[in-house]
Regions:
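Ribonuclease/tRNase effector modules and their secretory precursors
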Residues: 1-92
């Protein structure tokens, strides 16, 4: 599998910032996913989800951080972000 194209310049929507605060997800975590994505999937015209797996050392539990991006806008807009433990459902 070839390396996915990173997104280095982007903006956060107000909704994304609100959800990140509510879900305790930092801008740095989002930047890491977009700079070095492990997976990317087009979910609808102009929108993609970038995601990475990571392990929380405190609990040893594996999660996916999913970042939804409107990619047809320049610069791309981060629309929403969440983490999930549903690896089987989302990891391709």
């Amino acid at each position: 599998m070839s390396k996915l194209e990173p997104i280095l310049e982007f903006v956060f929507t107000a909704h994304a910032l609100k959800e990140m605060a509510r879900r305790d997800i930092t801008e740095q975590e989002v930047q890491e996913v977009l700079a070095n994505p492990e997976q990317m999937e087009i979910v609808q015209d102009g929108r993609a989800v970038y995601q990475n797996k990571y392990v929380v050392s405190k609990t040893s539990k594996t999660y996916i951080l999913r970042v939804f991006v409107d990619i047809d806008i320049k610069p791309p807009h981060v629309v929403t972000v969440y983490r999930t433990s549903k690896i089987e459902k989302y990891w391709r």
